């Protein structure tokens, strides 16, 4: 299956061909374990833990990142959540956008991707 951004479609042409949806396929099921749209065929669901500062954490509590979101810790210092999702670019971009208000606790692989992206951001802004 391919996903195309509507903002990238400039012309539509009817090819007079039909497409049969595979038996048992559901669009909701296809996107059930992702934040955003992108995923690869063999991507696995992982358990993600993210620590948020109190201000950002309140926002995340009221507007969950994903339907799998569970609150693990909710105290004066932090709000920590657990997600069960596929790690993809949209998730990484979302976490980077939270800046120092979010910290990936688990898994180490996601934490390393965030660190690598942050290092690239620093490199791109050096004079």
Regions found by a protein language model. Name each.
Residues 1-39, 45-48:
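Core beta-strand-centered patch of the WYL/Sm-like small regulatory domain
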């Amino acid at each position: 299956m391919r996903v195309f951004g509507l903002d990238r479609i400039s012309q539509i042409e009817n090819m007079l061909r039909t497409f049969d949806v595979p038996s048992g396929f559901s669009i909701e099921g296809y996107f059930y374990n992702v934040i955003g749209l992108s995923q690869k065929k063999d991507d696995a669901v992982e358990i993600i833990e993210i620590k948020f500062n109190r201000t950002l954490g309140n926002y995340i509590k009221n507007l969950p990142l994903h339907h799998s979101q569970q609150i693990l810790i909710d105290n004066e210092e932090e709000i920590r959540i657990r997600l069960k999702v596929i790690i993809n670019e949209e998730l990484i971009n979302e976490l980077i956008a939270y800046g120092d208000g979010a910290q990936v606790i688990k898994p180490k692989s996601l934490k390393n991707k965030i660190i690598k992206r942050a290092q690239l951001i620093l490199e791109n802004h050096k004079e």
